[in-house]
Amino acid sequence: MLQPSRRKYRKEQKGRNTGLASRGTHVSFGEFGLKATGRGRLTARQIEAARRAINRHIKRGGRIWIRIFPDKPISQKPAEVRMGNGKGNPEYWVAEIQPGKVLYEMEGVSEELAREAFRLAAAKLPISTTFVARHIGA
């Protein structure tokens, strides 16, 4: 699964996920893309589950790009531990997603196959998404 190899700090503050995506909003590498229309957090496991769903559907054809990376650690306290006594340990990694961000891209397959593969992938994700195609000349 995806996670950073090393970081300056182990833990990060919660923060707020606001605004629209300003970078990574266009299909840059492939012909078709899966774009987020909602906001939220995608865990490394969810990103991997969606990638597997896409790969299973397109079989050996085509090429896939993952345009997001889980670089934010989420900490949790163990079960049945009293409040206080510091922040919990980092348990998993998430990517903060804003509306407009392209999550996955694909090329080398027909549009129908790409649509179906992205539909299966979107079912694994907790945010709403839409299918987008590259605009030639844009």
From Swiss-Prot:
Pfam families: Ribosomal_L16. The gene is rplP. PANTHER family: 50S/60S RIBOSOMAL PROTEIN L16 (PTHR12220), LARGE RIBOSOMAL SUBUNIT PROTEIN UL16M (PTHR12220:SF13). Part of the 50S ribosomal subunit. The keyword RNA-binding applies. Keywords: Ribonucleoprotein, Ribosomal protein, RNA-binding, rRNA-binding, tRNA-binding. Binds 23S rRNA and is also seen to make contacts with the A and possibly P site tRNAs. Gene3D superfamilies: Ribosomal protein L10e/L16. One of its GO terms (molecular function) is rRNA binding. InterPro entries: Ribosomal_uL16, Ribosomal_uL16_bact-type, Ribosomal_uL16_CS, Ribosomal_uL16_dom, Ribosomal_uL16_sf. One of its GO terms (biological process) is translation. Residues 1-13 have a biased composition (Basic residues). One of its GO terms (cellular component) is cytosolic large ribosomal subunit. This is Large ribosomal subunit protein uL16. Residues 1-24 are annotated as: Disordered. Belongs to the universal ribosomal protein uL16 family.
